Amino acid sequence: VPHFAVDLSHIDEPHKHPALKEAGEFTDIREISLNLPREDGGLLAYSRAIAQWHKTHRFCGRCGHPSEPKDGGHMRLCTNPDCNTQHFPRTDMAVIMLVSSGDKVILGRKKEWAEDRFSILAGFVEPGETIEGAVAREVMEEVGIPITNIRYHSSQPWPFPSNLMLGFFAEAESETINIIDDELAEARWFTREELLDEAKAYAEKPHSVSIARRLISEWTLGIEP
């Protein structure tokens, strides 16, 4: 079944536009995705990523000439006949990992987050790096803790703008936190008991969007691999 997506990001208030005000409601993709079935959520994520790619890749990276959409928007072609380079949507690989030590898990807070907002650690995969290597490196860079027993859990597209999140569990070899880089304002250990109420609430909402929340909840409820 064909599906179509239209980028309206250039319109400040689309709900007031004469041609759109009767089209329905407009809302943030992160909010609506919480209430969508998995199939619709995936379609929405794909549409968002493709639209953003077209918006930010209007010129050929090889010769600088304009490029134009082809193949229903799944490819862009350089308009320079001497170049004729095909360009395809990019996907940035990132790892996100829940690191535990016995009955505790380490969560961090970014500097721009509210003081009560914490999440598991994450970071991008470097060129030429294995995803397992990225997991170990990011944990060491962010909290200075060596890890072992790295286990893959699942993946999730995160089109803000074009990430693919790869989720892992791992075990800490030390509980001494040493924030090395400047990404985190703080990091600390949380017990299962501290996270239990939120985990139970998540279990009642299986379509909830965040892979971070899924990993935390499954670990808290004891269903990790």
Regions inferred by a protein language model and the residue ranges of each:
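Short acidic-glycine loop/turn motifs at beta-strand connectors
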Residues: 1, 101-103, 174
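Nudix hydrolase/Nudix homology domain
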Residues: 1-57, 68-70, 114-118, 180-225
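Conserved hydrophobic/aromatic beta-strand scaffold that supports enzyme active sites
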Residues: 5, 59, 77, 96-98, ...
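Cys/His-rich short segments
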Residues: 45-98
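N-terminal strand-loop-strand
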Residues: 76-119, 124, 146-147
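The catalytic Nudix box helix
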Residues: 119-154, 168, 174-176
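Acidic pyrophosphate-coordinating catalytic loop
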Residues: 156-165
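Non-heme Fe(II)/2-oxoglutarate
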Residues: 164-187
